[in-house]
Amino acid sequence: MKKIKLFSIVAAFVAAFAFTSCNTGDDNNRYYQPLTPAEKQTCYSKTAGSRMRKLAYMSDEHVTAKDGKKEYYDTLDVVTSIHGDGKDTVMTVNNFPVKIFARYIPENAEMKDLKEALKKYEMPVNFKSVVYYYKVTPVVLFMLFPDAITVNLEYGGATHKVKFYCYSSGNSPYTFGQVTDKSKVEAYLVVYGYEVDPKDEKKPNPTAFNFNMAGTPLSNGTQIKFFEP
């Protein structure tokens, strides 16, 4: 059986978000305490700047073998920066290759024109994500709250606004950022669907990604990894 491998999530991340569990009354139960301004500044100093210059995305057109298992992903250049003051901090992604999303749109007559237009789209796309620093030790962890990724595509004799939606850290444990034990910054976003010419942008009504990867059907979104080489 072919195995689709999402990028690994460190155990520390799972432990970090344990604060969502309910109070059992146990004296040993610990509650999450927000970081102090000094701790946030420490997190910021370890993540700020244009460190993440690569992205990795799921693709069965690029197959590698690791420990006897096939992995399906490709890497591309990207410009990603984190700036702010440790309190109001934003991760900005510039020159995002939005055409990679064409792989996750179904092969059918209704989506054919959209899919083809997206494959050919070469213009740079930028988007932002609010950064919330969550943990400073043993590793820096931060939550991400990304904007929709918006692009205007020409097809079918008209211009169409297409928005791609990402889960925030509040909706998915697979959207987050961290500083690794090698002091490298990484960020992970889960893009789960798209909407063409939205009627009400304040109330998104996206179509979920629904695609096959190496013969395996997937419908719960795709993970994009931004990382420091």
What do these predicted regions represent?
Residues 61-73, 80, 201-202:
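Acidic, glycine-anchored loop motifs typical of Ca2+
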Residues 83-172:
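Predominantly extracellular/secreted and cell-surface proteins with exposed
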Residues 27-37, 164-170, 176-229:
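Edge beta-strand at a domain terminus
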Residues 52-61, 95-99, 145-158, 185-197:
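Generic short beta-strand segments
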Residues 41-68:
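Tryptophan-anchored aromatic micro-motifs
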Residues 3-11, 15-46, 218-229:
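Bacterial Sec-dependent N-terminal signal peptides
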Residues 74-80, 123-125, 129, 211:
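Generic detection of short hydrophobic beta-strand segments and adjacent strand-loop junctions
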